[in-house]
């Protein structure tokens, strides 16, 4: 707010006081929101780290199982078995609210299947195929869990950055400028008051003479 564009009036001073009070209140609320979002972010971060560790372990396990199954049965047989699946997992997307931020909720059905629902015949396959299917079903579950948590973290982090910018703008620009303008108006009003007092004294002095 440019001070030269402000009229040094009492009504303007009152308006500025209201703006300062409102800005300080908004600043306080935004700081609370920022701190709350940061707390939520770190809660989810710990969970995401655990899920990521589990995902890495599931990936290594599934790779080991498919390599073993391929060594025993041949890669062509393993791929042919995989293509016999008649039903595929379904993903459901919804959202929920964390301190005003809509984050994803990812649920799934049909990831884990009993042996008889996998599509391939029990006869003609062996336990290596079954263990590979188990490992990959677990891997898909971990991928879904990691996707939900990591997307949530990204959205929270984006909102934290936006809120921090607004907090800083109020704290270091808006509020200081409002306070400086308020002081300027007070100074000008005091100057005008002194000038008026001085003029009145001169008028009274002339009247006495």
Swiss-Prot record:
This is A-type ATP synthase subunit D. Belongs to the V-ATPase D subunit family. Has multiple subunits with at least A(3), B(3), C, D, E, F, H, I and proteolipid K(x). It is a peripheral membrane protein. Its main location: membrane. Keywords: ATP synthesis, Cell membrane, Hydrogen ion transport, Ion transport, Membrane, Transport. InterPro entries: V_ATPase_D (IPR002699). Component of the A-type ATP synthase that produces ATP from ADP in the presence of a proton gradient across the membrane. GO terms for cellular component: plasma membrane; proton-transporting V-type ATPase complex. GO terms for biological process: proton motive force-driven plasma membrane ATP synthesis. It comes from the Archaea. One of its GO terms (molecular function) is ATP binding. The keyword Ion transport applies. Disulfide bonds: none annotated. It is found in: Cell membrane.
């Amino acid at each position: 707010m440019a001070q030269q564009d402000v009229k040094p009036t009492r009504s303007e001073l009152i308006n500025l006081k209201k703006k300062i009070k409102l800005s300080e209140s908004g600043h306080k609320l935004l700081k609370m929101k920022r701190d709350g979002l940061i707390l939520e972010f770190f809660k989810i971060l710990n969970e995401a780290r655990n899920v990521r560790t589990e995902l890495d372990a599931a990936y290594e396990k599934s790779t080991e199982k498919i390599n073993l199954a391929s060594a025993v049965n041949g890669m062509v047989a393993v791929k042919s078995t995989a293509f016999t699946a008649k039903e595929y997992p379904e993903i459901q997307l919804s959202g929920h609210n964390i301190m005003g931020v809509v984050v994803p909720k990812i649920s799934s059905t049909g990831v884990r299947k009993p042996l008889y629902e996998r599509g391939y015949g029990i006869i003609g396959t062996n336990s290596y195929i079954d263990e590979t299917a188990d490992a990959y079903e677990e891997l898909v579950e971990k991928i879904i869990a990691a996707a939900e948590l990591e997307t949530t973290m990204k959205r929270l982090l984006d909102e934290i950055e936006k809120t921090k910018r607004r907090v800083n703008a109020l704290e270091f620009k808006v509020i200081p400028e409002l306070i400086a303008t308020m002081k300027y108006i007070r100074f000008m009003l005091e100057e005008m008051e002194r000038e008026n007092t001085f003029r009145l004294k001169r008028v009274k002095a002339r009247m006495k003479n």
